Amino acid sequence: MATTLKNHHRRVAIISYHIGKAYGLSEERLNNLVIAAALHDIGALTVSERDELIKMDVENPQPHARLGSYMLDSFAPFHEISRILYYHHWSYNRDDQWVVTKGKVPVESYILHVADRIDILQWFTFSSRRNQYFFIANSQRFLLVGY
């Protein structure tokens, strides 16, 4: 397994949990957020596709988000998780996206988007395991600026 993928989903789930908790999400919404974070790249079906995602996420992240959402949408208990996944690459501060969705993007999608970006950035920034765990453990403090 590629080093860029190893434990990525777990780290994103942990970061998402801390942001969601600080944001004041209910227990149910927090649980859905953590599940969505753990599954957020399910639309990239192979490890090589996931590695490619890291390279192309900036240019066109939507195909895997839509595919992952569609995969889960038909399972009733995962309907809300599917909605979170569908929008997990939508930026909070993009007016054009806000107009298109008319404010219907779940806040969990924005939280997941930020957590995913932070993990990818910190993974490439911090080389030592000690720094990575410090960042994850303190993510709640670092991430509240935009919320």
What are these regions (language model features)?
Residues M1-Y147:
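Histidine- and acidic-residue-rich, metal-dependent catalytic cores
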